[in-house]
């Protein structure tokens, strides 16, 4: 009879929540204050998810454009968790800003009110991004991830749909904190999180003692899809096939090494479908259409993110220090860069 899986803990920010008061992370005890939804007039439907419907709206008290996320009937505990996390992260770098929590006066349905972002659909946007754009937006996303991780929170659903980009204003926001959770060392978490193409190997092999590094895998998948112009990069037909797609790139021997290290027993179904695959070189994915987006630096970064072993993946802070981002850091350290954008807008207006 195989023993239990080996333990694991985050390499960074592991004790953040134990150093805070219980009130910070005990979301079940949180009592959100619900305002009146009548202050907001719904303008148009922006989309719908598994747990909500999202609308563009106007705050009639100040004419401000906002986004209203009307929550579908779901466990109170889940709503409390999302609200508590959004309140804890309020004001964080590139984190979507929660403006209000309201309820419909009649139906009593809860809704979350957020800042409005003039988002471009990623399927169109990713086709026009330059090499520098990709570096820039990935760096901005890393700021959001380092911030939430430093606050003891894993997002657990990083994917293009949850990264709003206003390309004209070069503004990025990480949205949809409905699956986010507080990190406590040695806690075993639900593996039914994240979206299939962005699920880390730990989820696919049912390893529950995961941590912030799960988000770094998802970010790696996004980066790969952007630089190789292959959306999604790992295109599994189901959760089993998803691991097969990953193994065809990262290799099966490497997968077995990971399983051995953490004493993970693989679902027997994998015996029939995994096969044997060698590790592929990242250069294999370069072709004429994506060559202008690929550099030795980005392949090195990608290689350090897309690792089976979650403990080996770069942390958000480590990733931000990677040479791939030097051009972005250089631009952001020049105080004139923002003024230049402003003045270029002004010169035409004069």
Swiss-Prot record:
Flavoprotein in keyword set: no
Protein's UniProt name: Casein kinase II subunit alpha'
Catalytic activity, as annotated: L-seryl-[protein] + ATP = O-phospho-L-seryl-[protein] + ADP + H(+); L-threonyl-[protein] + ATP = O-phospho-L-threonyl-[protein] + ADP + H(+)
GO cellular component: cytosol; nucleus; PcG protein complex; protein kinase CK2 complex
Ligand binding (ATP): 46-54, 69
PANTHER family assigned to the protein according to its UniProt record, in alphabetical order: CASEIN KINASE II SUBUNIT ALPHA
UniProt KW keywords: ATP-binding, Kinase, Nucleotide-binding, Serine/threonine-protein kinase, Transferase, Wnt signaling pathway
GO MF term (any one): ATP binding
């Amino acid at each position: 009879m195989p023993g239990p899986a080996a333990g694991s803990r985050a390499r960074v920010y592991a004790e953040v929540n134990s150093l805070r008061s219980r009130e910070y992370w005990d979301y079940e005890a949180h009592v959100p204050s619900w305002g009146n939804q009548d202050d907001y007039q719904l303008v148009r439907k922006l989309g719908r998810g598994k747990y909500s419907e999202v609308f563009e709206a106007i705050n009639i008290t100040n004419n401000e454009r906002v986004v209203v996320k009307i929550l579908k009937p779901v466990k109170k505990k889940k709503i409390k968790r999302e609200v508590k996390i959004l309140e804890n992260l309020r004001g964080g770098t590139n984190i979507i800003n929660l403006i209000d929590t309201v309820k419909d006066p009649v139906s009593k349905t809860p809704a979350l009110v957020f800042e409005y972002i003039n988002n471009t659909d990623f399927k169109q946007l990713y086709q026009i991004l330059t090499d520098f754009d990709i570096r820039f937006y990935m760096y901005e996303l890393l700021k959001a991830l380092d911030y939430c991780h430093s606050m003891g929170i894993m997002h657990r659903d990083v994917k293009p749909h949850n990264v709003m980009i206003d390309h004209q204003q070069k503004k990025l926001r990480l949205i949809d904190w409905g699956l986010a959770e507080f990190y406590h060392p040695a806690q075993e978490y639900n593996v039914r999180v994240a979206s299939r193409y962005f699920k880390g190997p730990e989820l696919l092999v049912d390893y529950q003692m995961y941590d912030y590094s799960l988000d770094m895998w998802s970010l790696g998948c996004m980066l790969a899809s952007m630089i190789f112009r292959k959306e999604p990069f790992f295109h599994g037909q189901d959760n089993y096939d998803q691991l097969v797609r990953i193994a065809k790139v990262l290799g099966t021997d490497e997968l077995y090494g990971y399983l051995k290290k953490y004493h993970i027993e693989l679902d027997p179904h994998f015996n029939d479908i995994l096969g044997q695959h060698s590790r592929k070189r990242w250069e294999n994915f370069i072709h004429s259409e994506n060559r202008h987006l690929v550099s030795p630096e980005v392949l090195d970064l990608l290689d350090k993110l897309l690792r089976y072993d979650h403990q080996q993946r770069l942390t958000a802070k480590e990733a931000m220090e990677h040479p791939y981002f030097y051009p972005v850091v250089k631009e952001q350290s020049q105080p004139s860069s923002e003024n230049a954008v402003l003045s270029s807008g002004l010169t035409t207006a004069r």
